[in-house]
Amino acid sequence: MNVTNAMPNPLIFTDIAAGKVKELIEEEGNDKLMLRVFITGGGCSGFQYGFTFDETSHEGDTRVKNGGVTLLIDPTSYQYLVGAEIDYTEGLEGAQFVIRNPNAETTCGCGSSFSP
């Protein structure tokens, strides 16, 4: 009998966000691209979220897949993003990727920076 430990996804990568990433990758014409989500110092609350496309997964990266799209998180950023939800919204304020982070004790008004 084989026993495997199923680990829950470290974060939620919504179908809507994955669909938008897939659309952007198709526009770029490079099916090797993956979306990297990362945390950097800065912003009005101390840390800020960043998004970029990357062709390479680095040692220690966490990979989350949805709809044929891969999301990458480096080990340092991972600790701040566990349990978060990556989504994409379109509204009167414009269209943007949104991170709903249960680890953030405070966030700024724009939602792009936080403090753990």
Curated annotation (Swiss-Prot):
Residues annotated to bind iron-sulfur cluster: 44, 108, 110
PROSITE patterns on file: HESB
Database matches in InterPro entries: FeS_biogenesis, FeS_cluster_insertion, FeS_cluster_insertion_CS, FeS_cluster_insertion_RrpA, HesB-like_dom_sf
Cofactor binding annotation: Binds 1 iron-sulfur cluster per subunit.
GO molecular function: 2 iron, 2 sulfur cluster binding; 4 iron, 4 sulfur cluster binding; iron ion binding
Listed Pfam families: Fe-S_biosyn
Cofactor: iron-sulfur cluster
Function summary: Required for insertion of 4Fe-4S clusters for at least IspG.
Name the record gives this protein: Iron-sulfur cluster insertion protein ErpA
Species classification: Bacteria, Pseudomonadati, Pseudomonadota, Gammaproteobacteria, Chromatiales
Gene: erpA
